[in-house]
Amino acid sequence: MRIIAPSVLSADFGHLADDLEMINRSEADWLHVDVMDGTFVPNISFGFPLMKPFKQYCTKPLDVHLMIVHPEKYVERFCDAGAWSVGFHLEAVEDPLPILEMIRKKGVRTCLTINPDIDVKRLVPYLEEVDMVLLMSVFAGFGGQKFIPETISKIRYIREEIDRRGLKTLIEIDGGVNTGNAAALFAAGADALVAGSAVFGAEDPIEAIRRMKE
């Protein structure tokens, strides 16, 4: 499985409808929506009001990544706003299971995320409880960072744990993804790659997406 999810955080918001139409015409599979609160990460992005134009102008499923504290207060509203999947950070909560159940009851796919400094083994107890795990390959909060190479070994580890249990849990990678490393990430066992500046900053974004899926 080779899923590409362009991150709308890197889009040109002065021409948002045009950028979303480009995504519609491309081979992209999902639209990745990064939600930041300025507390869990030192940056602020967007919230519920922008979910409406994302849903209105983009035909791709909305893959929502909550980089926020207290995700339990907001997951249901993002589900109601049109999210196809909702993920939140394991390190942001004491117990993820009740929050995952809130998402699941809305009929939305569940995802648990960790930053690069969180032990990947902490995801293992939840592999049977989620549809997807997201490994940050940069520190959450800003686009355009360089990929952290140690992510490759984490992908392999989680892939082995998923396969050993016979699960269908997907592995998504977010941060520093580009046409130069996408193939290696898929080869290591990733199913989905989030790409921001590598898509929206490319001379030919549609071609960049196609190349990453090769």
Model-derived segments and their meaning:
Residues 89-91, 115, 136-139, 196-197:
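Short beta->alpha connector loops at strand-helix junctions that form conserved
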Residues 1-87, 93-95, 102, 110, ...:
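Conserved N-terminal beta1-alpha1 strand-loop-helix module at the mouth
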Residues 81, 106, 188:
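Conserved dinucleotide-binding and phosphotransfer motif residues
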Residues 109-113, 117:
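Internal catalytic-core helix/loop-beta-alpha segment
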Residues 139, 146-192:
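Active-site/ligand-binding-proximal alpha/beta "capping" segment
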Residues 3, 113, 134-137, 172, ...:
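Conserved beta-strand segments that form the floor/walls of ligand-binding pockets within enzyme
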Residues 58, 106, 165-167:
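Helix C-cap/helix->beta junction micro-motif
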